[in-house]
Amino acid sequence: MPRSPRLPAFEPHTRTWYVSAEDAPPTAVSAPPFEGEFVLDAPSRREMAEDFGHIVHRMPAAVLRPASAEDIVRLVRFANAHGIQVSMRGQAHSPFGQAQVEGGVVIDSRSLHRIHAISTQGAVVDAGVRWSELLRATLAHELTPPVLTGFLELSVGGTLCVGGVGGATYRYGFQADNVLALEVVTGQGERIECSATEHPELFHSVLGGLGQFALITRATLRLQAAPTTSRTYHLTYSDSQRWIEALRLAAEDERFDSLKGKVVPGPRGTLSYLLIASKDFTPPQSPNDPEVLRGLNPDASVAPVIANESYFDWMNQLAPAVARLEKSGAWSQPHPWFDVFLPASQTRTFVDEALASLPLEDIAQAFVLLYPVKRERLGCAFIEVPTEQRLFLFDILRTAAPTPAALQRMMGDNQRLHERALGLGGKKYAIAAIPFTPADWREYFGPDWSLFEQRKARFDPRHILTPGQGIFA
């Protein structure tokens, strides 16, 4: 490629970027022209070397803020020609460097933030759109995505790569299971529109594919009629067995529109177990509370807490807690999150053992959550889950003190708990801060590993995409 003094340049032998070709040696080649920004400055690169976890720090050589999917096509083709690794970063909510790339180029998808269309046929949105932005926009049309994560300030592209779990997953699957079509850029730099009927192999590989086959630039998402109001229910249990049985019963008959469990410290060093659910409606209709709560048998000593709030406020329920964490500084501390899918038959055993092994102060400052999941609702080819039909996603979302010893202890906990979960038939959820070697990934995929390798060879043969997952050596 001819060199232009107005473009950054890359020297392939020393793997060095230069701000312009005028500063580069004769062997350097100019980067392609971009509509957006391609920057090499240290502050931009340092930002891309961080994520919500504050555990892994990989410094990229450059950052692309694309103006369009064509910018990503140009970058990926250039990267293929010169062996440069590339990753796409959304809201950087990954806890373990999954979207980072040492010495490569990070694509900052926040510049791709347009909502193109909203109708009963679906929402067409860029990958960098946040779910909070999308929900506000769809509610103006009395529509909503079927599944929303508890924290809405995540990017659409980011959650579709890993699945995306929320309180309605037990009814509708992952967020990635509610996608109608995608626009992607493969690891070879091909811009392709795909769906269940058009390039289905690519479509089903990318959803939940951990960024290994293509980068999502736009998605068409399923929408459904939205209510105006959510009636919320908080039921308290003093033992884990009745709590898990109640979650299983409520999930089986799908009486709630969202459903999860939460563990909180109780009196005198005990633990309390909450069933947190909602029933959505639009007045003058309203839920029948006795019928909704039938058979759930919470503690008689603690009255259920029942309240009405707007549907948006309920879906955005974590916003106040996040604001407090940001104000206290805890948001910028390390977050060694633990997330694992468990077979329902082993969930109580694992949860009890895990919680008994952790200091009470860890549980007190964490979000400890349990989501029921129905296997038949899940369709992502490469999100591995236990073989039982009834599952739970168990999350221990901790914040570590900003000291090496505290972080090392919690990361050790994660590895120990993961080994125990594997022994009970569990599977890691890929967002977790659990170190994995390529051999660990092969074990994770099991019989699907050969297909995963084949798809990688087809769509990203030079292995330039998303190395931060650590799947390939």
Regions of interest found by a model, annotated:
Residues 345-401:
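C-terminal structural cap/anchor segments
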Residues 323-325, 336, 422-473:
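Activity-critical C-terminal alpha-helical subdomain
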Residues 28-48:
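Conserved oxyanion/phosphate-binding beta-strand-loop segments in alpha/beta enzyme cores
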Residues 127, 348, 392, 400-412, ...:
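Extended C-terminal subregions enriched in glycine
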Residues 18, 43, 52-149, 162-168:
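Glycine-rich N-terminal segment of FAD-binding domains in flavoprotein oxidoreductases
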